[in-house]
């Protein structure tokens, strides 16, 4: 079992790129492998909410959206930190243009959509670089998601949880399933971290 800190993970990603892959390919591998595992678990297409931050964690979610809609899923996407995305996340947002069954929604629309219910809620707001306290608006969003129905999935690490120390904001997203990539992070294996991660699945993405 491989376990990497956030800093070690960044080093491994850079090493993979130095050997000839690209950050775009790593994101594609992460999002596609998570989507494929999820659809094996839930072969019946339904409704999903994907909550994205503006960085590469959200980019993984946008890749998932592309693969899920191809299998008949109806996807709502919420950009929780605005629409000024990282270059890789923006690239994957643009790849969704023109695809059916994908809708971008606002925070104002979210509560009504949650009342209708989602089969799956995928959270990709903050990734392994998070530490400290959640911004007020993200804490409120996590509270809303935590009290909603549907299978809850975190990408890499639940937002609000420090992946190295397992320190958690009181409003940390509470996942039923966490997909992590290339290696486990220390928080996935700690008793306090497991409270928020629940089942953690480590997926290979082409990183040693």
PLM regions and their residue ranges:
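Short, solvent-exposed coil/turn linker segments
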Residues: 22, 106-109, 162
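Nucleotide and nucleotide-moiety/phosphate-recognizing core
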Residues: 35-125, 133-155
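Positively charged, low-complexity intrinsically disordered leader regions
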Residues: 1-44, 208
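Conserved active-site and cofactor/substrate-binding residues in soluble primary-metabolism enzymes
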Residues: 4-7, 21-33, 56-59, 87, ...
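YjeF_N-associated NAD(P)HX repair module
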Residues: 1-4, 10-11, 16, 118-208
